Amino acid sequence: MAIAAPLKEKTVQKPGTTVYPILIIIGICHMLNDSLQAVIPAMFPILERSMSLTFTQLGIIAFTLNMVSSVMQPVVGWYTDKRPRPYALPVGLTASMLGILGLAFAPSFITILCCVFFIGLGSAIFHPEGSRVAYMAAGTKRGLAQSIYQVGGNSGQAMAPLITALILVPLGQFGAVWFTLVAALAVMFLMYIAKWYASRLGSLAQKSGKQKKTAENTAITKSVVSALIIIIFLIFARSWYTSAIGNFYTFYAMDTYHVSIQQAQSYIFVFLLFGAIGTFLGGPLADRFGKRFVILGSLLCSAPLAIVLPFAGPVLAYGVLALIGLVLMSSFSVTVVYAQELVPGKIGTMSGLTVGLAFGMGAIGAVALGALIDAAGLTPTMIAIAFLPVLGILAFLLPSDQKLREWHS
């Protein structure tokens, strides 16, 4: 508590300063939140055997988690843009904690879906408000701030393979109960964040008139709509590909390389770990070279690697997955900041739209890819999705960073 007063005083006196302690804490909370979500795909190999679920049913579980989060995130962002709710952050994590607790004891497929609904709802509340906190603490370093925030989430997702290998394989479904402790820790951190957030609202009240005027003067022109549509297509390409790897590459590795669940999960861990590193690097690169440059390079440079992956051997696959994760995910946080600058004054809405859309696209992809695997097999599906990053060529059509500044100057 000793740091609370100096921190508050510093942020009030110097609103343009990057508040690293808050960024680090909200990044840790993002990691804890997304580690709860990571329990779901981590549990797939366990549920597939213990409940005899099909790939389509596993896809429906992923769909429920991601679609609830996807639909609700823009709604939460829109609402809190108008009426900020600092304590929505701990409330959201409490909902996720209840979902995780129920998941540990769920006896049926339907019960699992109900528990996953609560986890998705908690995530939907957390993400736009967490992104807003990162924006408020960013100062002039928006790319770096969003990267710190998003790398926490990607690090949490990267825990899924470790969760499977170290907890769920030896303990089974009941092992999920330990993650109620993770949720409780996140709630404690978020209570502190909420207090800082509430204090910042007071100091920002003097600027609210100017920000409101900026938001009102930001016309949603055809050019803005066109840019948002392109962003949506790029999110689609990235989300479907990462959904395929995150949800189903474990089964591909087990089938193709004849490895155990634990060994197969190591491939996912490498992909997600380097994805987290890429997410962190993307923000500073965007601050230096421009957001459109990073978005374009991220997808186009990962395309040839994605095409090589289905033909790689068991050892080479580690390196290819690491490079794909590093390059492809470097645009994740950058896409959020680009959308926020595309429509200034709508921080929560744009964060909810882009991140929520990523969840939603991943949800649809999980169901579609699960059905495709059931119908065509694992290998043909992995070859087919390898061409998704090629859609990154659409980023050439995005307005440059300079053009965005001219639109809103």
Curated annotation (Swiss-Prot):
Keyword check for Cell membrane: yes
Molecular function via GO: transmembrane transporter activity
Record's bilayer topology term: Multi-pass membrane protein
GO cellular component, one term: plasma membrane
Protein location: Cell membrane
Keywords: Cell membrane, Membrane, Transmembrane, Transmembrane helix, Transport
A Pfam family the protein falls into: MFS_1
InterPro entries named among the record's database cross-references: MFS (IPR011701), MFS_dom (IPR020846), MFS_trans_sf (IPR036259)
Disulfide bridge partners, by residue number: none
Transmembrane segments: 22-42, 58-78, 99-119, 174-194, 217-237, 266-286, 293-312, 316-338, 353-373, 378-398
Stored PANTHER family: FOSMIDOMYCIN RESISTANCE PROTEIN
Family: Belongs to the major facilitator superfamily.
Protein name: Uncharacterized MFS-type transporter YfnC
Organism of provenance: Bacillus subtilis (strain 168)
The gene coding this protein: yfnC
